[in-house]
Design a protein with these regions (language model features):
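Core segments of alpha-helical transmembrane spans in multipass integral membrane proteins
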Residues: 31, 35-39, 59-79, 96-100
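Non-cytosolic membrane-interface motifs at loop->transmembrane helix junctions
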Residues: 52-60, 114-125
Length: 158
């Protein structure tokens, strides 16, 4: 086996692993967003972990309203994951908006106080996963550029 073929197989295996990891992360975010968004849409403020006692009608109203956008984000993540080869352009934006959600939680924590203990790991994930997702996206894009510039995309070299 010559070096060009070995190089091509190494790139393909690594690219497949990165793409699969990226897709599964997007599917996981999608599942969490769909489940938790639907839960809050149906259950209102009582469905939020750590919520206890009566809640102001305005807060419940806002939570149910914004839960629809969380569900939509889940659908969008699913669509991008399912069509990653043609919709990879959206991955950095997904990472950015996920990070902004974490920043929102941090602002709330600093301004109001710590949330229910289950939401603290969620906030940590909202800071870590966007970096991982963007890193995978960047490396995947870089590999695609390398593959196309070396002629590996068409299966021929030189």
């Amino acid at each position: 086996m010559n070096k060009d073929v070995m190089f091509s197989k190494e790139i393909n295996n690594e690219e497949i692993r990165m793409e699969s990891t990226l897709k599964y992360l997007l599917y996981a975010i999608s599942a969490v967003a769909l489940i938790t968004g639907a839960n809050v849409l149906i259950g209102g403020a009582d469905a939020v972990p750590g919520s206890s006692g009566p809640v102001e009608a305005t807060v419940d109203n806002e939570l149910r309203f914004f839960s629809v956008y969380w569900v939509a984000f889940g659908v969008f993540c699913f669509w991008v994951a399912r069509n990653i080869n043609t919709q990879a352009f959206f991955v950095p934006f997904i990472a950015l908006f996920f990070l902004l959600g974490g920043i929102g939680r941090l602002v709330s924590t600093l301004a109001i106080g710590a949330p229910a203990s289950i939401l603290v790991p969620a906030m940590v994930l909202e800071f870590v996963l966007p970096v991982v997702i963007y890193g995978l996206y960047w490396k995947h894009q870089k590999m695609n550029i390398t593959k196309h510039s070396t002629g590996l995309a068409s299966g021929s070299r030189g």
